[in-house]
Amino acid sequence: MFIIAALYHFTRFENPAALKPALLELCKAQGVTGTLLLAPEGVNGTITGSRAGIDAVLAHLKALPGCDGLEWKEAQSERANFGKMKVRIKREIVTMKQPDVDPRAKTGHYVTPADWNALIAQPDVAVIDTRNDYEVEIGTFEGAIDPKTRSFGEFPAWWEANKHRFHNKKIAMFCTGGIRCEKSTNYLLGQGVEDVFHLKGGILQYLEDIPQDQSTWNGACFVFDNRVSVGHGLQEGPHLLCHGCRQPILPADKKRAEYEEGVSCHKCFDQTTSEDKARFRERQKQIELARKRARA
């Protein structure tokens, strides 16, 4: 059984690139795979491996300067959910492109999953999903507003264009594991919004804690590993990933004329050029050759 750990922490790294070699070496030595992002504002990522391997990496991360409060969520899987280990150096651990946003200074009020349903049922509360459009498409909370953003960096512009809709409203925000809400609630507070709340632990914590018969969540939650989606109890969902556009699809979608493994699906067929598709076919060919060599 493999452990999947989704983690993040906002802190100040003076030289994140200097942290990469030892972290990458440890992950490889422990057989841990996945992706970790290091930036001046902290660390973010998802990794998978054995219990001992994950514990070793988490201990290493918690020992980094200012990281003793590292947040992570765990789930179990019968397979490794990443092919290799990557440690990347970025400007931000979650890209918002708002240099004045700093979750270390202040964030919205945390709301536990146990209290979330009561909060979002209040008539003076506006519930905003801060995730990308393709994530919202497969699942969200009842009555939640979908900003229809293609990336988190589009959220500030959406808020600026729509903030008049929320005059005298309390704002409740949610995302997959909590990291985007750390930034979005700080951003709204900086814009003068007084009552800002966010779901502690994100959707993943809610799906783990709240029984389905008491839940206001509809659908599945997109996750950034080979599970693609999860439902209540963090059970693996039905979705697959189109490797042409990295968006979730259902098994039935593979029967559509637009689907070609590793190349396209009905969501992206008209969005890519013939040159793109040729490049994706070559990539898929190399993947299949690598699989054959691994089985030989």
Swiss-Prot record:
Q: Gene3D superfamilies, alphabetically?
A: 3.30.70.100, Rhodanese-like domain (3.40.250.10)
Q: Name one Pfam family in it.
A: Rhodanese
Example GO molecular function = oxidoreductase activity, acting on paired donors, with incorporation or reduction of molecular oxygen
Provide the Rhodanese domain boundaries: 121-215
Keywords (alphabetical) are: Oxidoreductase, tRNA processing
Reaction it catalyzes: uridine(34) in tRNA + AH2 + O2 = 5-hydroxyuridine(34) in tRNA + A + H2O
Q: Active site located where?
A: C175
Task: Write out the similarity annotation.
Answer: Belongs to the TrhO family.
Question: What does the UniProt function comment say about this protein?
Answer: Catalyzes oxygen-dependent 5-hydroxyuridine (ho5U) modification at position 34 in tRNAs.
Q: Which NCBIfam families match?
A: PRK00142.1-4
Q: What is this protein called?
A: tRNA uridine(34) hydroxylase
Native source species: Roseobacter denitrificans (strain ATCC 33942 / OCh 114)
